[in-house]
Amino acid sequence: MSVLLIALFSLILLLALLGAAGVFTWGERRLLGFLQERLGPNRVGPFGFLQWVADTLKLLTKEDAPPAGADLAAYRLAPALAAFPMLAGFGVVAFAPRLVISDLDVGVLFVMGMLALTVWALVLGAWGSRNRYAMLGGLRAAAQMLAYESFLGLSLMGCVLLAGSFRMGDIVAAQEGGLWFILLQPLGAALFFLAGLAAAHRLPFDLQESEQDLVAGFMTEYSGMSFALFFLGEYLAILLVAALFTTLFLGGWAGPILPGPIWFGLKVAAISVVFVWLRAALPRPRYDQLISFAWKVALPLALLNLLVTAWIAVGRAA
């Protein structure tokens, strides 16, 4: 694509992502209401659809006052660091064969790097707030990301071995006309999904902002637009993890009859619904259970899956 087309597509994608994150907040609340046998938002607009617009306007008009003694540089930087890397991660996501801003040779690694940056936002926000609850949340976030990032990378390496490339388009092309990698890599898909929940800080892996014991965790001292940026980063992270899962395991844009971008969007929406369903269905484990599961169960399984996949790939090549 020319520079002008790339700029135009980037602007359209930015607006679409911001709108999708807002609509997702409404959809999550409606779905949680249905799963918990209550109404959910139903006052602002038809079926409460404009509730996310009202919430956005409310947060834009609220005062954003840092606490006394806060490290202002870290306090202000953290919300931006939570949201902007997620937007950058979508720059390498291939929505169709030629519908991508930059199809990097290391696209998968780039997205993983952007997801890993979220922990810096959480730690900076906790440190800058000078609040005990926030610091506990930041420490939990750092330990959790260290544990789950380890097998997040290993779980997707099976797809990279089968496709022979880190490029998003090549991974989707390897699944076209054949089996999706979720059928060839069921264990890898399950482990990647669990690690994705942790990377997006979603229940049951949201112990860094556990309301029962940490008030709001690293976000305790935030309000107004800074608070909104943290939430925007969280919902964009869900969409980014869902987009990466779709690319790696669900054939990306591949599908019959409908155009590729529509298939891609439907698959991402389905994965996002599963995220919400798990939030309604699962309890929150103890912190030590969560970390023990990552190091003692998930990491060995990810290594085993990688070894078996490598053996199969070498056998094919031979």
From Swiss-Prot:
Q: Provide the top EC class.
A: translocase
Compartments reported by the entry: Cell inner membrane
Chief place of localization: membrane
Cystine bridges = none
Sorted alphabetically, which Pfam families does this protein's record hold? Answer: NADHdh
Which GO-annotated molecular functions does the record name? NADH dehydrogenase activity; oxidoreductase activity, acting on NAD(P)H, quinone or similar compound as acceptor; quinone binding
Keywords of the record: Cell inner membrane, Cell membrane, Membrane, NAD, Quinone, Translocase, Transmembrane, Transmembrane helix, Ubiquinone
Catalytic reaction list: a quinone + NADH + 5 H(+)(in) = a quinol + NAD(+) + 4 H(+)(out)
Summarizing the function annotation, the protein's role is: NDH-1 shuttles electrons from NADH, via FMN and iron-sulfur (Fe-S) centers, to quinones in the respiratory chain. The immediate electron acceptor for the enzyme in this species is believed to be ubiquinone. Couples the redox reaction to proton translocation (for every two electrons transferred, four hydrogen ions are translocated across the cytoplasmic membrane), and thus conserves the redox energy in a proton gradient. This subunit may bind ubiquinone.
- How is the quaternary structure described? NDH-1 is composed of 14 different subunits. Subunits NuoA, H, J, K, L, M, N constitute the membrane sector of the complex.
Protein known as: NADH-quinone oxidoreductase subunit H 2
- The organism is Cereibacter sphaeroides (strain ATCC 17023 / DSM 158 / JCM 6121 / CCUG 31486 / LMG 2827 / NBRC 12203 / NCIMB 8253 / ATH 2.4.1.) (Rhodobacter sphaeroides)
Lineage start: Bacteria, Pseudomonadati, Pseudomonadota, Alphaproteobacteria, Rhodobacterales
